[in-house]
Structure formats: structure tokens, C-alpha cells
Amino acid sequence: MVSVSEIRQAQRAEGPATILAIGTANPANKVEQATYPDFYFKITNSEHKVELKEKFQRMCDKSMIKSRYMYLTEEILKENPSLCEYMAPSLDARQDMVVVEVPRLGKEAAVKAIKEWGQPKSKITHLIFCTTSGVDMPGADYQLTKLLGLRPYVKRYMMYQQGCFAGGTVLRLAKDLAENNKGARVLVVCSEVTAVTFRGPSDTHLDSLVGQALFGDGAAALIVGSDPVPEIEKPIFVMVWTAQTIAPDSEGAIDGHLREAGLTFHLLKDVPGIVSKNIDKALVEAFQPLGISDYNSIFWIAHPGGPAILDQVEQKLALKPEKMKATREVLSEYGNMSSACVLFILDEMRKKSTKDGLKTTGEGLDWGVLFGFGPGLTIETVVLHSVAI
């Protein structure tokens, strides 16, 4: 008779979880940051708020963002004036948009990832879907399963309302699933649409205005699995270690609340300070066992919550400017896409590494780190190993 331990052994993969493919997608509507303040104050009927507009213009100028992509066009906003008012009851209108658009955008990214992976979609065993945009039953995971035509017995995990750290969360969960289920192939999708947070400006809620200057829409998808099939599957990164922690004394630093007016969010001014204060401890925990203490010797993928976070992390760790190049590039081209951001940066890094003729997918380096920061204040850490190109 077979023992439980023998069954357990047979159920586990032999090797570590690897990222086998990456796909990304954005809405067609591209917004230029330089002209966005004019558009935003006009569409929200707020042009009389001259000082507030000047303040918003300064926020946009300092954001280090050149462009963003948004589902919300001028036409859609004119048809839904409740979204343009500050705190007007508008949840129904927002929900009607995002329950359709979130899985649709996720499908676009997933189709690209599946194509790169090169295996039939029938080999997908697990699906992780993550979004901060809207809640519904059955969820976006179910809708995506239908849209892609996945098998009805794919094992699904739906993560709602996680926020900006969740790009790390989905990797952590995908790693555990891939390594503990022999032959598992996990489709990971993060899809974010700002229709839940868009609203007119207010003198009394400046952190909402910060969000209007930073957030953009995007979806990213990965295929994750252990023991890649030779000749067919080509690993891009190996996931070595993961952690999640709540930063001490950070309660209320970032939070969001779903209300009749949509998703409202609040952040303390010292969010960059809290992140930079706790980053060293997270790095020591992750890299001391590997004998790495020079953080300029690893590649970097950090959630670009805003330029101030990146600036303070660089300063605290004395990082060379090029360490955050891929991160800043994604922030500049797309804005803050919440959970999808770090997955876009993974894609940017591996493409640029190949284009520049470097030896590995991680800018020619072997080891790297991926950080997610978000509500809590929660920090996700993922240790990555690159793959030879």
C-alpha cells in the first residue's frame, strides 16, 4: 500500500517555480500627462478652481509620468456625469463598467502570455486573478475562464481589493501552487481599471488628487510553472523566495474604502519614509542567506507608487540611478497601474536585457528583488534569479 508521504512526494514538483511567459495590455485611450490637468478640470466642471488646478499641474509635473492609458474617455465621462463630481453616488455606473472591462483587459494580456508560452491553453491548471477594480459574483476569474475558453475544472483564486502590493502577492501564491502541484501551469492575471477611483477635485481631499495624477489602467499576465518542458517552455525568471510583512507603526498609511461614490483612498505624507525605513530589513532577511549585502549587485523591480518612494529607497540604500531604470521607465510610460505595475517592469527588463545583448534576463545580473508596496502598509518581497539569454 502507498503511504501518505509517498503520495505527497509524487505530488510535488522537483524544481523551483519559473516565469515562463509575460503578456501585457492597456486600453486604447492614451492620455498625455502634460495636457491632463486641462482635460481633468474641464471634464469635471472645475475650471473655476484656479489654485487647485495649479496645485494639480505641479503634481503632474513632478510625477515623472509622460503618459497613461485609461478606459475612461471624454465620451464615457460625459455620458456618466456622476463620475466627474466629487463624492457623488456613482457606484452602480462604475461597477457596470469594471465588471466587463477588467476581465476583458485581462484576457488581452493573457492571450499574449499564452501565445509566448507556446503550450495549448488546456494545459493551464490554475488561475489567479487579481484586481482592485470592482467586486462581483461570480468574479472576474470566472469571466476570464469563459472568455478564454479554459477548462471548467481549472482551479481558480480570485483576489479583490488588495491594492498596490498585490503584484508580489500573486507571484508568492503562484510559486507555492507551482512547486506543490507537479505539472501545474498557473495563469496569473492582474487587471486594473481606474474607473473605480476617478472623481472630481476637492480642496479638502488632496490625497485623492494625488491619485488622479498617478493612476493608469493596465493588465499583465504570466504563466508560472516548475520543471519546464525542454525545447517547448523557456523560463524567463526563477522565483526563489517570497515574504510579506506589515511595516511597524504604519496603520492608516495607505487605505481605501468602497463607498457609494466609488473607491476612495487616503495616504499619509510619509509613505515614502515608511517604505525606505523598512526596506533594509526586508533586504537583509531576503539576501543574507545568499551572502549578498551589496544591493547594487542585484537587479531591481519596485512598485513605483510615485517618484518620491523610488527617490527615498535609492537614497537610503545608496543605489546607482540605473538600478531603478526599468521601474522608472514603466512609471513614465504607464503611470501607477497598481498590482500590474511590477509585472510590466519584469516584461520591460527582460526585453531590454535581450535588446542590449546582455547575458541574462536580469540586466546581465544573476540575482534580483521585486518589491510590492500597498495598503497596510504591506510590503511584498520576491527574490528572483535571472535566466541566461
From Swiss-Prot:
Keywords: Acyltransferase, Flavonoid biosynthesis, Transferase. Pathway: Secondary metabolite biosynthesis; flavonoid biosynthesis. Its EC number is 2.3.1.74. It catalyses: (E)-4-coumaroyl-CoA + 3 malonyl-CoA + 3 H(+) = 2',4,4',6'-tetrahydroxychalcone + 3 CO2 + 4 CoA. The active site is at 164. It holds the Pfam family Chal_sti_synt_C. GO terms for biological process: flavonoid biosynthetic process; polyketide biosynthetic process. One of its GO terms (molecular function) is naringenin-chalcone synthase activity. Gene3D superfamilies: 3.40.47.10. It comes from the Eukaryota. Belongs to the thiolase-like superfamily. Chalcone/stilbene synthases family. The primary product of this enzyme is 4,2',4',6'-tetrahydroxychalcone (also termed naringenin-chalcone or chalcone) which can under specific conditions spontaneously isomerize into naringenin. This is Chalcone synthase 3.
